[in-house]
């Protein structure tokens, strides 16, 4: 999630990036594909490869401070400058991010997450909900 109430977004030298941490019982190389979709169509995709680090018997994968693409930076700027929250939500209704983490060597999908956004009216800042989809 993101906090649009911060003033740092207007700083010309602001850094826009994402940090992700994954963990596994197995040593492997992973690829993380992040697709930005607008109105159901893919706009941009970023694919990153990460190698395991053994940390106390667990294999940890850290993608740290991965820079956002220019499309995302511009999107955030335009969204932040809309005058009303309902306008922001109208834009966000047609915006999603799909992230797929796979074993690079076997192509097995390890994790698939879809991010759907809305502007929170909460006094407590950004909120999130996590749902797990399973086969029955």
Curated annotation (Swiss-Prot):
UniProt entry keywords in alphabetical sequence = Activator, Developmental protein, DNA-binding, Metal-binding, Nucleus, Transcription, Transcription regulation, Zinc, Zinc-finger
Q: Which organism is it from?
A: Junonia coenia (Peacock butterfly)
User: Is Transmembrane given among the entry's keywords?
Assistant: no
Biological process according to GO: embryonic organ development; hippo signaling
Protein name as catalogued: Protein scalloped
Q: Give an example GO cellular component term for this record.
A: transcription regulator complex
Q: Which domain of life is it from?
A: Eukaryota
A single GO molecular function, which one?
DNA-binding transcription factor activity, RNA polymerase II-specific
* First-listed, main subcellular location of the protein, grouped into a coarse class: nucleus
Keyword Protease found:
no
Its annotated compartments are: Nucleus
Kindly give the InterPro entries that the UniProt entry links to this protein.
TEC1_TEAD_TF (IPR050937), YBD (IPR041086)
**What does this chain do?**
Probable transcription factor that function in the regulation of cell-specific gene expression during drosophila development, particularly in the differentiation of the nervous system.
